[in-house]
Amino acid sequence: MAQHSVEMILMRQLADYLSVPVVLMDTTGTVIFYNEPAEKILGVRFEETGPIDRKEADRLVELSDDPAAASCDAGHPLDIALGERRPAHSHRLMLRRTDRVRLQIEVTAFPLIGQEGKLLGAVAMFWERPGP
């Protein structure tokens, strides 16, 4: 992560200590890190993938709106965090891994803003949603 800002490096360090699944994304949509709890849900270790560009991430993990979700839940929190520079939460998204396992998840994402208001990336925390 030598070419990343200090803030992004510190966020990666913090994510490594958290028990909640965390994905760290830069402004181009490249996943630059995900922690061990995220590996368990995503079904692949970060050591195996390394940083993942947006196209490859979409191939590895498919996110879609849950048809049962309310309209206020529409949208993907990471896209909102990066595009609108504000935090966002989705109560119901469907995640499908490359092994075809489908999980209903909740996602909270927020932008990382550096000095002078510069957008550095975004962080998503997510977890499997129990029940319907």
Describe the predicted segments one by one.
Residues 2-27:
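Sensory modules in modular signal-transduction proteins
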Residues 31-32:
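Conserved hydrophobic beta-strand signature of PAS-family and PAS-like sensory domains
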Residues 35-42:
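N-terminal capping loop/helix in small sensory signaling domains highlighted by a polar->aromatic N-x2-3-F motif
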Residues 42-43, 50:
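PAS-family sensory domains
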Residues 48-95:
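Terminal output helix/cap of sensory domains in signal transduction proteins
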Residues 112-132:
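Sensory coupling linkers of modular signal transduction proteins
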